[in-house]
Structures are given as C-alpha cells and as structure tokens.
Amino acid sequence: MKDIEGLILPEPQKNSNPSWFGFLISVKEDAGFTRNELSEYLESKKIQTRNLFAGNLLKHPAFNEMRQTGEGYRVVGDLKGTDFILNNTFWIGVYPGMTEEMLQYMISTIKKFIAFRKV
C-alpha cells in the first residue's frame, strides 16, 4: 500500500515481527479527503474501522470537566501532532487468520476510494 497517496501508513521496524491486531491509517491534511470520508466509505463496503483513542486526549469528552476548571492536567507545547492524530487517524481491523483475498479486498477498496476522489 506504499503507493497510495494521501495516507501515512505504519512500517515494521528493522528486525521486528509485529503481530498486527489492527492496521493504523492516518490521512494527510492535503489528501483531498478526510478520515471520516474514507472511514465511512470503508464501512459501507463492509470493512470495519475504529477511530484511534489517542492523540490529544484533553479534547476527549472524559476531560470536559478538567478543561472547564483548568485543573488536573498540564500542557507542554502546542500539541499540534496530537491534534493531527486525533483528527486524522483510524484503524482497520486485521488478524492473523486473514486470507490474501481479504487483504486484497481492503487494499483495492481503499485504492478505489482514492481514485474516485481524484476525479
């Protein structure tokens, strides 16, 4: 999937053998589509997605009271990278028993979405 424009994809580290439970996808800010648009399209094609519970946790509803009172946390820096992760990143589910056909379906579905968005 390295040739797919508009996405940031994970790569295993040298000398590693990861056991993927999900495949993380980040949509670049200049991709021409949003995380939600891609995620909704994949869901419509029976590919399950989940937003990543990470990024700027202070913007999650669980922190509403802390934000209102300004107590119980501290912020270092502008958190720009964490905002990007919060707004642009999601998972597609994978597991060791997936067949090559299943993987190719996911890849081709993502490529079709991006090709359609370029028109």
Where are these regions (language model features)?
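PLP-dependent aminotransferase class I/II
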Residues: 1-119
